[in-house]
A protein has these predicted regions:
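Histone-fold recognition with a strong bias for associated Lys/Arg-rich disordered tails
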Residues: 1-162
């Protein structure tokens, strides 16, 4: 089986999730790190903003991450994927196989994230979109399919300054 390709924007989010995990000194990269990284993605941020205040979601995610046990500073380590993150990826790959797409993208991962059971990230995202998954996913797909609206998929400006840890 060929390796899974990621779109550039998803690769950026993936790397940012790992960075957030390392900055928090967490042993495992979790869906919550991914959700925090997704909030830095302009189109995702704007879509969330049409349902609720993204800063509320951001604060709830980082409250969870702050309460998560961290690796002591004197210990060297490499973060690994949590079981939930592995399940998220597995579900996303299955979804990709059904839709016959060439590269994994943000919309695939978000769809799988919303379906993830026993996940704080799934719960918080669902709560912030008022559990209107179908409407949220339609808006998210529209946002990512609208290339003319935002040629840059990530930003460090707008009102995203609160996102940096």
């Amino acid at each position: 089986m060929a390796p899974i390709q990621l779109t550039d924007r998803l690769e950026h989010v993936r790397l940012r999730a790992f960075t957030i995990c390392e900055q928090c000194r967490h042993e495992f990269v979790m869906p919550e790190h991914l959700l925090a990284a997704l909030l830095e993605e302009t189109k995702f941020f704007r879509t969330i903003n049409s349902f609720s205040n993204p800063s509320t979601l951001y604060n709830e995610i980082f409250e969870f991450l702050t309460e998560t046990e961290s690796v002591p500073m004197e210990i060297d380590y490499e973060p690994t994927l949590s079981t939930q993150f592995q399940k998220l990826l597995s579900d996303t790959v299955k979804q990709m196989n059904f839709s016959e797409v060439e590269a994994m993208d943000i919309i695939h991962v978000v769809n799988s994230l919303l379906d993830l059971e026993d996940s704080w990230a799934s719960y918080l995202l669902g709560k912030s979109i008022h559990n209107e998954k179908a409407e949220f996913m339609c808006q998210l797909i529209d946002a990512y399919n609208d290339q003319a609206a935002d040629p840059q998929s990530t930003t460090e400006s707008e009102d995203l300054s609160l996102i940096h840890i």
